[in-house]
A protein has these predicted regions:
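N-terminal signal peptide c-region/cleavage motif recognized by signal peptidases
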Residues: 21-23
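Small/polar, glycine/serine/threonine/aspartate-rich low-complexity segments that form flexible
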Residues: 28-29, 76-111, 236-245, 291-325, ...
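Sec/SRP-type N-terminal targeting helices
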Residues: 49-53, 66-67, 113-140, 190, ...
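Bacterial Sec-pathway N-terminal export signals of envelope proteins
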Residues: 26-74, 78, 84, 228-271, ...
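Periplasmic alpha-helical coiled-coil/stalk elements that build and connect Gram-negative outer-membrane
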Residues: 32, 142-257, 364, 368, ...
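A short glycine-centered flexible hinge/capping loop motif at secondary-structure junctions
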Residues: 182-186, 393-397, 434
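Bacterial N-terminal signal peptides that target proteins for export
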Residues: 1-13
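Acidic, low-complexity, intrinsically disordered peripheral segments
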Residues: 25-27, 38, 228, 416-441
């Protein structure tokens, strides 16, 4: 009995230990940095996986085109039943020729000797592979941009929530102090009501900010292709990026759109159209093919297969095909030329638009950098004003309205400061995407 009890207890202990271990793991939250978020997204996001699969498909198509240069072999077979024999007339004599049953079978091997259209198709498919690679690069840049801005958005929501929560706790403390003084008869009911209103007015903002944190984290999880229930924390705050803002003011990097993915893709599309035009011109060129046949034939009047006599024969043929006239080829050339002209005009127009957009991002970064510098000083002054208002109220020389006003000014200065850093960072992320900068850890 004791042995059976021992056997029954062991599984229960193991289950309990496993539950404890799982509980410990669940309690450990992932501390996420921007680089980690980007790397997870690049490895798990379906958009990137689809782009990589597209490259593989294009490479397979390219190999299929190259295979057109290799010989092709096929086994053929035919049976012919003569219904009415052919009648021939010679020197006034008529006679019929032909056998009721004819069989033919063998192997045919063909090889393209000169196929200019195939050679142009090979160049076209290679450019198509390059275009797929560039599109995959654009997908990665777009995903990095989305994850980066989502991470900054989450930091902004987190920092805003921290500022509002601290302000709410301070307003609660102010209300507690004012209420205590009111009960002692040292302040008026108006001061008590003002402090309470200030506290309650902040509560909806705190709740909204908390919801904003959850929503921004959820958006980040979706981009990383992670389960929405996963809990994690963000490392750092927007204040940690202040050095990047001031470093951006000092540096004077050359701004160029030569790596822009949109322009690169349009250039490749123009190249493909030009190659397609060259391919269409090859429709006027001759093609030469070599063919080898090794066949067996048999003719019989009956169906006695075991008595059939099969006779082999073989031949080699060289065929030349010269297109003389096909009007569709001329219209195709005209259409392709028009498409090239349209795409080149769109490319020039897009380049001008992107240059304007680049300047807009630079202006936004400069304006945000100036705001960060100004708002940082505003926080220092607002903190001093709040401390003075608090001291004046404590000694009875200030009013609760002045204290509330100072508290609001400090909160607003902190929120504006973090917003300015966020605006700078998002404009910088958009600029890097526009300039075609690849992510480097």
């Amino acid at each position: 009995m004791r042995k059976m009890c021992s056997i029954g207890i062991r599984p229960m202990m193991m289950v309990a230990l496993m539950q404890c271990a799982l509980s410990t793991i669940a309690q450990e939250k992932l501390a996420l940095t921007l680089d980690q978020a980007i790397e997870i997204a690049l490895s798990d996001n379906p958009t990137i996986q689809v782009a990589e699969q597209t490259i593989q498909l294009k490479k397979i198509s390219d190999r299929e085109t190259v295979m057109g240069l290799l010989p092709e072999a096929s086994i053929t077979g035919a049976y012919t039943r003569t219904i009415k024999k052919q009648t021939m007339v010679m020197n006034g004599m008529k006679f019929q020729v032909g056998i009721p049953n004819q069989y033919q079978g063998g192997i045919t091997v063909s090889l393209p000797v000169f196929a200019p259209a195939l050679y142009k198709s090979m160049k076209l498919t290679k450019t198509d592979v390059e275009l797929a690679v560039e599109q995959a690069r654009a997908s990665k840049q777009d995903l990095v941009n989305q994850v980066t801005k989502a991470f900054y958005q989450a930091l902004l929501a987190q920092d805003s929530y921290a500022v509002l929560e601290k302000s709410f706790k301070q307003s609660e403390e102010n209300y507690r102090i004012v209420n205590a003084k009111y009960e002692q008869g040292r302040v008026s009911e108006f001061d008590k009501i003002s402090a309470e209103v200030q506290m309650r007015n902040l509560q909806p903002s705190v709740i909204s900010a908390r919801n904003g944190v959850e929503l921004s984290k959820l958006q980040l999880l979706v981009l990383m292709n992670i389960e929405p229930e996963t809990e994690f924390t963000l490392q750092g705050s927007l204040n940690d990026y202040e050095e990047i803002v001031f470093a951006g003011i000092l540096t004077n990097e050359t701004n160029s759109l030569e790596n822009n993915s949109s322009l690169a893709q349009m250039d490749m599309n123009v190249k493909m159209l030009q190659q397609n035009l060259s391919l269409n011109k090859q429709s006027f060129a001759p093609t030469i093919a070599l063919q080898f046949n090794y066949m067996y034939t048999c003719m019989a009047n009956d169906f006695k297969f075991k008595d059939y006599e099969w006779n082999p024969y073989s031949n080699v043929s060289l065929s030349v095909s010269i297109p003389v006239f096909k009007y569709k080829n001329f219209s195709t050339l005209k259409k392709t030329n028009i498409q090239i002209s349209q795409l080149m005009q769109n490319r020039d127009y897009t380049a001008r638009q992107l240059a304007m957009q680049q300047q807009s991002y630079l202006n936004s970064m400069n304006a945000s950098a100036e705001q960060v510098s100004s708002n940082k000083e505003a926080i220092i002054q607002a903190q001093k004003g709040r401390d003075i208002a608090e001291k004046l109220y404590e000694v009875g020389r200030g009013t609760v309205l002045e204290l509330n006003s100072a508290e609001v000014a400090l909160t607003q200065a902190k929120l504006t400061y973090t917003q300015a850093i966020y605006d700078y960072l998002t404009a910088k992320a958009d600029l890097e995407k526009l300039q075609g900068k690849d992510y480097v850890k």
